[in-house]
């Protein structure tokens, strides 16, 4: 039986959203992590901790029901459901077109009620956005901004960000290291960057596949007090 998560007390409006399917930014160099603030342990607020706890409870889930209604099972729908559990609707204030990209709806919400940043230090519960994780406009080019979103769980001492998202068949943990964006794993087998884009036979030569290569920006919706 497939794992199923049911959230009680929430309401999701049915909508057809496009985005996050499949596993416009040039990152030829990594981000330097020599700041004293980089990669230090960040104390999360109770609300940030609660958001992360909800996200971890979804790991392995393949369907998510809210008030008996199954929500859109993509990265944006999962991210929205997690925040809705804590009284925040990430779709509020975003474009309402029937076939809107859910990731861009969330991004528009943050422009109004949150803040964007590039790190290097991130907080538990932050959002992380990615570009070009699939050919959204189906033109065969690498020109698809804001195609994926996840929720930061933690940041390790080496700068690797662990985030939770739905990429393939289920909600899972994924890794991203912005200091070494082109490295999948170290010689000793530690994963630094997971693959977020599937390799296709007709991909352009400049196509990237790893999380660090596809990174766009972080966003804070629930700020430190």
Segments and roles (model prediction):
Residues 40-42, 91-173:
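...with weaker cross-activation on analogous glycine-rich loops/strands in unrelated enzymes
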Residues 25-27, 134, 138-225:
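Aromatic- and glycine-rich peptidoglycan recognition patches
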Residues 81, 105-109, 189:
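Alpha-helix boundary/capping detector
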Residues 1-7:
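Bacterial N-terminal signal peptides that target proteins for export
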Residues 22-97, 111, 208-225:
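N-terminal capping segments
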């Amino acid at each position: 039986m497939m794992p199923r998560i049911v959230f009680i007390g929430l309401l999701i409006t049915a909508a057809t959203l496009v985005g996050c399917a499949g596993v416009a930014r040039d990152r030829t160099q990594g981000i330097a992590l020599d700041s004293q603030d980089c990669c230090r342990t960040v104390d999360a607020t109770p609300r940030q901790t609660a958001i992360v706890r909800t996200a971890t409870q979804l790991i392995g889930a393949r369907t998510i029901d809210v008030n008996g209604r199954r929500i859109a099972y993509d990265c944006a729908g999962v991210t929205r459901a997690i925040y809705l559990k804590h009284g925040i609707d990430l779709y509020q204030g975003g474009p309402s077109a029937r076939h809107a990209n859910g990731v861009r709806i969330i991004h528009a919400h943050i422009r109004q009620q949150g803040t964007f940043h590039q790190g290097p230090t991130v907080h538990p519960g932050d959002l992380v956005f990615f570009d070009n994780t699939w050919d959204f406009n189906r033109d065969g080019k690498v020109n698809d901004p804001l195609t994926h979103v996840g929720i930061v769980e933690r940041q390790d001492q080496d700068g690797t960000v662990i985030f939770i998202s739905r990429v393939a068949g289920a909600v899972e943990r994924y890794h991203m290291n912005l200091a070494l964006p082109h490295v999948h794993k170290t010689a000793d087998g530690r994963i630094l960057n997971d693959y977020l884009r599937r390799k296709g036979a007709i991909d352009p030569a400049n196509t990237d596949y790893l999380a660090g290569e596809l990174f766009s920006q972080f966003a804070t919706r629930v700020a430190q007090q």
